[in-house]
Swiss-Prot record:
GO terms for cellular component: plasma membrane; proton-transporting ATP synthase complex. This is ATP synthase subunit a. CDD domains: ATP-synt_Fo_a_6. It is found in: Cell inner membrane. GO terms for molecular function: proton-transporting ATP synthase activity, rotational mechanism. Key component of the proton channel; it plays a direct role in the translocation of protons across the membrane. GO terms for biological process: proton motive force-driven plasma membrane ATP synthesis. InterPro entries: ATP_syn_F0_a_bact/chloroplast, ATP_synth_F0_asu, ATP_synth_F0_asu_AS, F0_ATP_A_sf. F-type ATPases have 2 components, CF(1) - the catalytic core - and CF(0) - the membrane proton channel. CF(1) has five subunits: alpha(3), beta(3), gamma(1), delta(1), epsilon(1). CF(0) has three main subunits: a(1), b(2) and c(9-12). The alpha and beta chains form an alternating ring which encloses part of the gamma chain. CF(1) is attached to CF(0) by a central stalk formed by the gamma and epsilon chains, while a peripheral stalk is formed by the delta and b chains. Pfam families: ATP-synt_A. The lineage of its organism: Bacteria, Pseudomonadati, Pseudomonadota, Gammaproteobacteria, Moraxellales. It is a multi-pass membrane protein. It comes from Acinetobacter baumannii (strain SDF). The keyword Transport applies. Belongs to the ATPase A chain family.
Length: 291
């Protein structure tokens, strides 16, 4: 694996595998693919991680196609093994929603299913050997576009990109705001922030504690999307880094370590998708509660 990239030292190899394929606007006004991490950083807000965007959208399309195919082929007869597996996933997610979400919305179950399967597929990419697809990308970049193969970056695990995880968590945050205001109204939503957790009966004390309540509740409220994003990103990034470190070891040690870690990582992959889904359901359930 790593031994094939003779020109890269171990730190360079790690940095190369943790760098995204970035397209954006340089300080001089030109648009280009970044050839180094420093160039990507200089692009600022205009930087687009093409690999993360491509894989996340592609996996989303695969998810939709698979479920569409199963839905079209579904019948009252004996289901196929694949159809049975899909039905088990749907029943599991639907049961989780029924047990956790106590409001009335037809959106929650499809949303939870989308989150769970989509994140699971993105996480699942972490089980592909770290060099396989990046080496193909480097070969194509060098032979088709004349690029330096060491400057071709191609990460394949979208959930190790904080931009992807933060984007998903911000989408959930928007839904939390929507449900909170829809169920409680603007006044009720603001009142919930201003009058909790301290709500004494004395009107003077109540007024004095409003700033304290607002600070505490706003910090808690705004921490939800951040914690959602960082929890998923941190766990998947750490898992990918361990695979990269294993790839730096001699070939005979790689298999002895990578196989047990991959088996354990299957649990991490599934658990992180489940946690993100369940926290989303819990947050939306809290937003839908009327006090």
């Amino acid at each position: 694996m790593a031994a094939e990239e003779h020109a890269l030292t171990s730190p360079e190899y790690i940095k190369h595998h943790l760098t995204n394929m970035t397209y954006g606007k340089m300080p001089d006004g030109t648009w280009k693919l970044a050839e180094t991490a420093e160039e990507a950083h200089s692009m600022g807000f205009t930087a687009i991680h093409l690999d993360s965007m491509g894989w996340s959208i592609g996996l989303g399309v695969i998810f939709c196609l698979l479920f569409w195919i199963v839905a079209r082929a579904a019948n009252a007869g004996v289901p196929t093994k694949f159809q049975s597996a899909i039905e088990m996933i749907i029943e599991f997610v639907d049961s989780s929603v029924r047990d956790t979400f106590h409001g009335k919305s037809r959106l929650i179950a499809p949303l939870a299913l989308t989150i769970f399967v989509w994140i699971f597929l993105m996480n699942l990419m972490d089980l592909i050997p770290v060099d396989w697809i990046p080496q193909v990308a480097a070969f194509v970049g060098a032979n088709a576009f004349g690029m330096d193969p060491h400057h071709v970056y191609f990460k394949i695990v979208p959930s190790t990109d904080p931009n992807i995880t933060l984007g998903m968590s911000l989408s959930v945050f928007v839904l939390i705001l929507f449900y909170s205001i829809r169920e409680k109204g603007v006044g009720g939503f603001v009142g919930e922030l201003a009058l909790n957790p301290f709500n004494p009966s004395n009107p003077v004390a109540k007024a004095l504690l409003i700033p304290v309540n607002l600070i505490l509740e706003l910090v808690t409220f705004l921490a939800r999307p951040i914690s959602l994003a960082l929890r998923l990103f941190g766990n998947m990034y750490a898992g990918e880094l361990i695979f990269i470190l294993i790839a730096l070891l001699p070939f005979w040690i790689q298999w002895a370590l990578s196989v047990p870690w991959a088996i354990f990582h299957i649990l991490v992959i599934t658990l992180q998708a489940f946690i993100f889904m369940m926290l989303t359901i819990v947050y939306l359930s809290m937003a839908s509660e009327k006090h």
